[in-house]
UniProtKB/Swiss-Prot annotation:
Single GO MF annotation: structural constituent of ribosome
GO cellular component, one term: small ribosomal subunit
Record keywords, A-Z: Ribonucleoprotein, Ribosomal protein
Record protein name field: Small ribosomal subunit protein bS16
GO annotation (BP), single: translation
Organism phylogeny: Bacteria, Pseudomonadati, Pseudomonadota, Gammaproteobacteria, Pseudomonadales
Family according to the record: Belongs to the bacterial ribosomal protein bS16 family.
UniProt xrefs under InterPro entries: Ribosomal_bS16, Ribosomal_bS16_dom_sf
A Pfam family: Ribosomal_S16
Length: 83
């Protein structure tokens, strides 16, 4: 099954996540089909907290990809900010 989920990056104590489209059997930070955005939970100042390619996210959801719980919240937040 294809899922849209977060892949952790960054360094120790400074998380950074990529929104990735991947097979659910792949490792969290492993192989992916496409990166469709990023999420920086500790963004400060002028840094961008969330960036999502809405067109690609809509495409993958239309193809049957299942978002994780957190990604579903982030997609909703991004859609609200874009409107």
């Amino acid at each position: 099954m294809v899922t849209i989920r977060l892949a952790r990056g960054g360094s120790k104590k400074r998380p950074f996540y990529h929104l990735t489209v991947t097979n659910s059997r792949n490792a969290r930070d492993g192989r992916f089909v496409e990166r469709i955005g990023f999420f920086n939970p500790i963004a400060a100042g002028g840094e961008v907290r969330l960036s999502v390619d809405q067109e690609r996210a809509t495409y993958w959801l239309g193809q049957g990809a299942q978002p994780s719980e957190r990604v579903a919240q982030l997609l909703k937040e991004a859609a609200k900010a874009a409107a």
